[in-house]
A protein has these predicted regions:
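A short acidic, Gly/Pro-enriched loop at the edge of an enzyme's catalytic core
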Residues: 12-21
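Short, well-ordered beta-strand core segments
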Residues: 2, 22, 47-49
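Short beta->alpha connector loops
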Residues: 8-9, 28-33, 113-116
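A short SAM/SAH-binding and catalytic strip from SAM-dependent methyltransferases
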Residues: 20-34, 52
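Conserved SAM-binding strand-loop segment of SAM-dependent methyltransferases
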Residues: 1-13
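S-adenosyl-L-methionine-dependent methyltransferase catalytic module, highlighting the catalytic core
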Residues: 35-43, 47-136
Length: 136
């Protein structure tokens, strides 16, 4: 089943339903309360796949050094048109998972071409453009 709901508003309608997997694709950074959303989703699903852009990527950092809000192929919107509320890096997200005791079962770091690479895997906070997590 596919269910779409405003997760910022809560997911009370689905408590106790016991989904196997929930997917939050490139949306965690758009939520008002991402920590609460992750807590709530893991109450109704055994696992959650979360994908997020890495705002610590070197290309975005370079944009900031130039004095402008950065954009990239993964984040093409201008600062005044973006839905992103919480800009986080891979290190920030993994820190939140540790803080909340969310078990990261698997993680994949993707470069700007959308593939895994030695640089993205070795220095993900600097060279990964996006990350994919399986948490439970």
């Amino acid at each position: 089943s596919v269910i779409q709901q405003d997760i910022d508003g809560g997911i009370q309608n689905y408590k106790g339903m016991g989904f196997d997997v929930a997917i939050m694709a490139s949306s965690i950074q758009c939520l008002r309360r991402p920590r609460n959303a992750m807590r709530n989703i893991l109450q109704v699903a055994n696992e959650c796949v979360i994908t997020l852009p890495n705002f610590g990527n070197w290309e975005l950092r370079l944009g900031l050094l130039k004095g402008k809000m950065p954009s990239s192929a993964q984040l093409p919107a201008k600062w005044y048109e973006t839905k992103n509320l919480h800009l986080c890096t891979i290190a920030d997200f993994e820190g939140l998972c540790a803080e909340e005791s969310f078990n990261i079962k698997k993680k994949v770091y993707l470069n700007t071409r959308g593939s895994s690479s030695w640089l993205a895997n070795t220095f993900p906070n600097l060279f990964a453009a996006e990350a994919v997590y399986l948490i439970g």
